[in-house]
Amino acid sequence: MEKRLRLAPSPTGLFHIGTARTALFNWLYAQKIGGKFLIRIEDTDFLRSKSEYTKNILEGLKWLGLKWDEEPIKQSDRISIHKSYIKKLLECGAAYRCFTSEDEISELREEQKKKGLPPKHDNRHRSLSKEEIETFISQGRTSVIRFKIDEKIEIKWIDQIRGEIKWQGKDLGGDLVLSRRAKGYEIGDPLYNLAVVVDDNFMNITHVVRGEDHISNTAKQILIYKALNFNLPTFSHTPLILNSEGKKLSKRDCVTSIDEFREMGYLPEALSNYMAFLGWSPKSADREILSLEEISKIFDLSEINKAGAKFSWEKLNWINSQYIKNIESIKLIEIMRKYWDDNGWKPPSEEWANKLAILIRDSMTLLKDSIDQSKPFFLIPTIQKEGQDFLEIRESKLSLKLILNYLIEKNTIKLNKEKAKEIINEISKKHNIKKGILMKSLRVAFFGSLSGPDLIQSWELFAESKTDRTRIERCL
């Protein structure tokens, strides 16, 4: 039997990191067991669902490298099919029309609140006669369709992450609403729990992997599966992603959408690598930097933790920095060039751009760090106070004068790393100036401060862009 998994996001907002991790776990497990990874867009919330969010989700999946195996389906295209199954449940007596008004439901909840009881429908219309139904309809009252839940029943299943889970019928909030309100004998638009079961069955889904916030929904859905004589899939409920305070990660935590991570300068490979270990502790992994292909070979749902997983910016940043260090230079330059173009910076040659990328990559945590790291190579920076103070040292300006005179005198030389070292050594010996003074003086001239990337490699780049002399001259 073919193994089939799915991601079923609701397009009511931007692609969230929680949804992305669920997608990743589904994709990894599908790869591990030789199954298929499918997409279903659950867009039955017509007020909040938007096509731009659907597009955003699909583009986010592509960016993360999570390819699906069949054309995505939209739940909204299958409303008539969902209604036909609600009709079957009505006909077999597993569901009924409920005419309880919104005001009556509010009154019931107020009473329960006063008594300290959880909100729960009292199933008052479960046994209406045909005459009573016709009376309500003639009065113009609208109805929802409710699915009967036996309060004495115990629902249990073996969860691949959590082991055996038990749920009591009495704790499910009363008979389950399957459809929105409608007039007469019409059936309103189907709601989440019914549509999910019908569509998972239609798609032949064998494994459902989703967040732990769906556990109560699973209990309800199992009852619908059984009422419709559908085969039950295997369920797995992943832990929530938590913020630093141990609370569920939300929009209040600033960055939650994949778009935001992308704009901040995270590589998709790094974000996927980090998300894979967010709540999963593999026994067989001997290192933390792994490709999706490598992760899929060792991925095991049973090793996913039950407790919530705290999001760590420090860990994500470290992983991203490792990927930046090891990314192909051509790809890194391509990414950097977008930042350079945005700032109107043009490298003098491809070779120069390649040398710059290699020089600054080890200092980068995020891709956008390339802006600050590249800036002093395109623009001459202002000399900071620490640099100005250092230039007050007599030997500092003398060092720069001697270096400048050497460059003017040897105008025809092509300065490379070896030649740069030779110049420093020669001047140091000839004029009895410490190399440290010479190099710090140059650093101030080039970068405006006493810090920066490798000086010798930087000098080679400044020489190629013909700005090394200009930078030295301004200090004299």
Swiss-Prot record:
GO BP term (any one): glutamyl-tRNA aminoacylation
Primary subcellular site in the record, as a coarse category: cytoplasm
Motif position, 'KMSKS' region: 248-252
Positions contributing to ATP binding: K251
An example Gene Ontology CC term for this record: cytosol
Reactions performed catalytically: tRNA(Glu) + L-glutamate + ATP = L-glutamyl-tRNA(Glu) + AMP + diphosphate
Role noted for this protein: Catalyzes the attachment of glutamate to tRNA(Glu) in a two-step reaction: glutamate is first activated by ATP to form Glu-AMP and then transferred to the acceptor end of tRNA(Glu).
Name of the featured protein: Glutamate--tRNA ligase
